[in-house]
Amino acid sequence: MDKDLLISNIKKMKKEQNAVIVAHSYQVDEVQEIADVTGDSLALSQFCASSQADTIVFCGVHFMAESAKLLSPEKTVLLPEINAGCPMADMVTAEALKEAKKKYPHAAVVCYINSSAEVKAECDICCTSSNAEKVIRSIDKKDIIFAPDKNLGSYVAKKVPEKNIIFWEGYCITHHKIKKDAVIESKRLHPDAILLVHPECRPEIQELADFVGSTKQIIDYARNSEHDKFIIGTEMGVLYQLKKENPNKTFYMMSTGLICPNMKKTSLQSVHDALAKRQYEITLDSGIIERASGSLNRMLAVGK
């Protein structure tokens, strides 16, 4: 089926099923083009929580679709590519987190949204890269277990030094592989460019950046900045929105290897098939929904 026919069919089925298509900023361009909303994990969570649609087609990875189901359990949530997972999310399990809670019984537990529903059920509150600092500041306790991303945890620890952050040993394999030498070389090649990186990068990479922020914050920074040249230190899918909003600005990827294979699995065909076959539906145990949705709703109550 050619692209135009796929898009036409998607629009038709979406209307018939009262469905919305949400896409993370790391999705391929053609998927972002047909989405009703694009953004980072926080923006998409907020959208799903308030959506009046009956069906949410979530173009992202598994934990994101689970989060949409947790926030809107009465809705049908479809994940076009059921094997689109997240290695970082797999680096923490509910069982391991339970053991950490026994080791630090007086600590609060914050989990990055990049985690399974079962893990979210064991934590006090969730966060995203957009609101991690605000979430940490909202917690009364001094000791905080932060899972699974140690790089985001390190970033927050510097912002909120009065807290004792207990790091998990997790990381994003795409951001974590950025090396200091590559950053220095990028800055040498583009001396007039501003370096924007994601807090999932290693601390030594964050220190070299002119700005550290989530994908949405990076997009906002580039839009509002007077500068016209930027080096981008996050997954390359963000270039779609950056170039769309800033046609007269120049963006250089820090590395051509900044690709999340799981985010790239979703295609127009798989979005079409998700609607046509009503696949793949996210289902969660009612007990998990009750416990895990609380951590997400507490995050949303804290705000952006």
Swiss-Prot record:
It comes from the Bacteria. One of its GO terms (molecular function) is quinolinate synthetase A activity. Its cofactor is [4Fe-4S] cluster. Binds 1 [4Fe-4S] cluster per subunit. [4Fe-4S] cluster binds at residues 86, 172, 260. Iminosuccinate binds at residues 24, 41, 112-114, 129, 198-200, 215. This is Quinolinate synthase. The lineage of its organism: Bacteria, Bacillati, Bacillota, Clostridia, Eubacteriales. The gene is nadA.
